[in-house]
Amino acid sequence: AAGATTSEPADPRRRVGAANAAARVQPTRDGYMNAIQQYPWADGALYQVYTAPGQVTDIALQEGEQLVGPGPVAAGDTVRWIIGDTVSGSGAMARVHILVKPTRPDIATNLVINTDRRTYHVELSATSATYMASVSWTYPQDALIALRGANAAAASAAPVFAGIDLAALNFRYRITGDRAPWRPRR
């Protein structure tokens, strides 16, 4: 009916559960590049990562991104999960890797990773054998900013005068006087 609104569940736990379910991002076949699941970055998404005992899953952050704060990586269950971090590369190409490994199957926890650029929300699930070797992200907003910058640079490099017939220009003249650095060459 026109003007009708969808009512929310009265129980706030059901509202939270529904919001979390809507925010979950599952791995997709098209998202894989070799063994790396590449998720498109979105603020507030809950990225699903599947792990297995005896296997390390690498959560790779963006190049140049750095962990920040006194506890930049926090997990809900730090007893049954082994979580560490390392860095590959150096300088602007340095890349932080969060390494996770469950101690047993059929457990789950969440992981919050705070960096100088964003906060990642990850839900970890342990299976008996199936695991994701590596997870990383693509950053559509960063690509859009870079594209806008490239377009602005191209526009500023474009010729000032468009539509001039170069064949109609007259170069039969002579310039005399001092040789100033701004003096025309033709």
Predicted regions and their residues:
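A general "mature secreted/periplasmic domain" signal
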Residues: A1-R186
